[in-house]
Each structure stands twice: as C-alpha cells, then as structure tokens.
Swiss-Prot record:
Function: Probable thioesterase involved in the biosynthesis of gramicidin S.
Active site (record annotation): 95
Keywords recorded for this protein, A-Z: Antibiotic biosynthesis, Hydrolase
Enzyme class, spelled out: hydrolase
Gene of this entry: grsT
Classification lineage: Bacteria, Bacillati, Bacillota, Bacilli, Bacillales
Natural source organism: Aneurinibacillus migulanus
Catalytic activity, EC: 3.1.2.-
Source organism superkingdom: Bacteria
Pfam family, one: Thioesterase
Name of the protein in its database record: Gramicidin S biosynthesis protein GrsT
GO molecular function (one): hydrolase activity
C-alpha cells in the first residue's frame, strides 16, 4: 500500500491543505466515524488542517474488523501518524476518542519526543479515575441497547431497527471493550495545555471528573461546560470551534 493510500485510510482530509501550519486530529466517540467532524474544517482558518481519524469498522472501513484493545489502536495510529506530525499538531477526542487521544499523545511523546501543542478532551472523565462500570460490552443485547439509549447518542429509530442494530452492535461492543479494558498507568504530565469540554446535562461526566484532567499537564488548564448531554458537541460545536480556534491561533501567532 502506498503512503498516500495508507494516510487516506486512517486520516480523513489529511495532507490536503498546502497552507496548513498546524494539524488538528479529531477522534470520534464509541461507534462513531470520521464523519462526526466532517463539517468542522469549514470553520477553521486555512492555516489549520482538520483531520479526522478513521478506525477500522467505521463508514468507508466498515468491512474491516473493529479493534478491541486501546493499546493496539494507539500503537498502530502512532506509527501511521508520523508523516503528518511534521508540523505542530493538536488533538481533539470525544468520549472514547478523548481516551485514545490522551494515550496516543503519550505514545508519540515516548517514540518521537514531541508533544501536541494542545490537547482538547471532550465528554470523558480524567483517565486516572476508574470507570464505574467496565463490562457494558458483555451485556445482553437488550440491556446493552438500553445503555446506548441512556447516552442519547443513537437515534431511537436506529435503536429499534433490528437489521441496523445487527450491523452496529459488534462495532459498539468492540468500542466499549476498548474503554472497559483500559488500565491507567502513571506517567509525566504533558508539557502542553489541556482543555476539557463537558455537557451541563451529561450525568455520566461531572465537572469534578473533568477538572481532574488538570493533573495531566504542567501547563495551562481549563474546563468549558456547554449546554447539552453527553453528545453536546453537536449542539455546541460552533462554540467549541470558536474556543479551539482562539487557542490554536495563539500557537500560530508570530513570536515577538
């Protein structure tokens, strides 16, 4: 497989903007694909290239077997991303994507001795806080679907479509297994700012659990709360984008 086809396999909209001076890598939530961030590139300045990471089992990679181990995901993506971190870069991850972005940034730091310029984590408690429940992926279908319903991220019409759910359930179980099997390990905090985004009505991710991300950086830290539940990033995306643009422009500003 050529370099270009391999990049296009894992990263959507990558290396297409010759004016880019910074890349923002976006990692979706459990069960989600790169299309979750499809429109975001339209709202960032041309100096910032917005790339979505596409994991196996999603959308155009739907025929591939989903990965069920976070470390395996991180090791593969950390290798594939190397040609794209030739300019400053940042991560945005939502829910499961926040956990992946955190461990991916750690692995890149270890392998390449470079930090992202900013880590944006969304809809996920700090990694050092154990999950209250880790075995969602082992639940019978009916109970598992009820858990999905409580998160309010899957339309009811889809949850009630047996044929559609037969396609989605293996992917969703794989992703919940990724989160449920995660084991946090202590390491040095990052030398980059971290921003934690949360939904004011997200009962599963409290302000306090977002505030705990502070332990993971030696630099600036902030929590931004927006209207909405666990999937607030849809109704509050413009506010999130405005905040991220402001933070990333600080990186691009000429040093005097």
């Amino acid at each position: 497989m050529t370099f270009i086809s391999q990049v296009n396999k894992w990263f959507v909209n990558a290396n297409v903007n010759s004016a880019a001076k910074l890349r923002l890598f976006c990692i979706p939530y459990a069960g989600g694909g790169a299309s979750a961030f499809y429109e975001w590139s339209h709202f960032f300045p041309k100096e910032i290239e917005v790339c979505s990471i596409q994991l196996p089992g999603r959308e155009n990679r739907g025929a591939e077997v989903p990965l069920t181990n976070l470390q395996q995901i991180v090791e593969i993506v950390a290798e594939e991303i190397q040609p794209l971190i030739n300019i400053p870069f940042a991560f945005l991850g939502h829910s499961m994507g926040a956990l992946i972005s955190f461990e991916l940034a750690r692995t890149i730091r270890q392998k390449s001795n470079v930090n992202p310029v900013h880590l944006f984590v969304s809809g996920r408690h700090a990694p050092q806080i154990p999950c209250a429940k880790q075995d969602y992926h082992l639940l019978p279908d009916e109970q598992f679907i009820q858990e999905l319903r409580s998160l309010n991220g899957t339309p009811e019409i889809v949850l009630q479509d047996a044929e559609m759910m037969s396609i989605l359930l293996p992917r969703l179980r794989a992703d919940f297994s990724v989160c449920g099997s995660y084991q946090y390990k202590n390491d040095e905090p990052f030398e980059c700012p971290i921003t934690a985004f949360g939904g004011k009505n997200d009962n599963g991710v409290t302000y306090q659990s977002l505030e705990a991300w502070r332990e993971q950086t030696k630099r600036e830290f902030s929590v931004c709360m927006y209207p909405g539940d666990h999937f607030f990033l849809y109704e509050s995306k413009y506010e999130m984008i405005e905040f991220m643009c402001k933070q990333l422009r600080l990186v691009l500003a000429p040093k005097i």
